[in-house]
């Protein structure tokens, strides 16, 4: 509502100025009346006292009528502002509570997720350990097999070398025996037998 084309804040300021001015005027009137009354002895109720009371009543009624709507409007606006502020604060409180619940839920989920990640890492570690152990056992088995083959090869090589040495020694010994014990007649007879076998 506009009073003489004024907005609410200007109207409030004007009402405050009017109230302060009227109170100052009344106080000045009481001070002047008291000053004049100090010269004479109190006489009781005087005609000016009636006018003063009437003046005060008119002023109070005028102030009441003038300020009733602006003060009521200001108080209503203030009450509405406080209600809006309370509603806004309640909404913020509710949002904060929901956000807190969401954060708590996320923290619980993060705890569960962290436990799951740790469990996954443990499983991966156990699987890696099993793979490493299996690989190490396979490598050890291969190394053992290769060592066994190498030992067998070395034994076989040593056997063949030993056989060859024994054979060479036997041949040398047989040759020595043959050269010692063979006579020219035996030699001639052996050559004849060999030639007969070769021709056949």
Swiss-Prot record:
It is found in: Cell inner membrane. It comes from the Bacteria. Keywords: ATP synthesis, Cell inner membrane, Cell membrane, CF(0), Hydrogen ion transport, Ion transport, Membrane, Transmembrane, Transmembrane helix, Transport. Pfam families: ATP-synt_B. InterPro entries: ATP_synth_b/b'su_bac/chlpt, ATP_synthase_B_chain. The keyword Membrane applies. F(1)F(0) ATP synthase produces ATP from ADP in the presence of a proton or sodium gradient. F-type ATPases consist of two structural domains, F(1) containing the extramembraneous catalytic core and F(0) containing the membrane proton channel, linked together by a central stalk and a peripheral stalk. During catalysis, ATP synthesis in the catalytic domain of F(1) is coupled via a rotary mechanism of the central stalk subunits to proton translocation. Component of the F(0) channel, it forms part of the peripheral stalk, linking F(1) to F(0). This is ATP synthase subunit b 1. The lineage of its organism: Bacteria, Pseudomonadati, Thermodesulfobacteriota, Desulfobacteria, Desulfobacterales.
């Amino acid at each position: 509502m506009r009073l003489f084309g004024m907005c609410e804040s200007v109207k409030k300021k004007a009402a405050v100025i009017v109230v302060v001015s009227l109170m100052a005027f009344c106080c000045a009137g009481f001070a002047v009346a008291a000053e004049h009354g100090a010269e004479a002895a109190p006489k009781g109720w005087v005609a000016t006292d009636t006018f003063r009371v009437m003046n005060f009543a008119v002023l109070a009624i005028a102030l009441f009528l003038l300020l009733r709507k602006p003060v009521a409007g200001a108080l209503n606006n203030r009450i509405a502002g406080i209600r809006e502020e309370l509603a806004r604060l309640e909404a913020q409180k509710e949002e904060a509570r929901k956000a807190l619940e969401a954060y708590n839920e996320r923290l619980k989920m993060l705890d569960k997720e962290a436990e799951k990640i740790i469990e996954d890492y443990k499983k991966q570690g156990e699987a890696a350990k099993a793979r490493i152990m299996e690989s190490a056992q396979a490598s050890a088995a291969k190394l053992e097999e290769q060592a066994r083959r190498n030992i067998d090869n070395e034994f076989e090589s040593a056997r063949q070398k030993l056989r060859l040495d024994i054979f060479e020694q036997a041949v040398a010994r047989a040759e020595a025996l043959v050269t010692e014990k063979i006579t020219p007649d035996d030699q001639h007879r052996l050559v004849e037998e060999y030639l007969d076998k070769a021709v056949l």
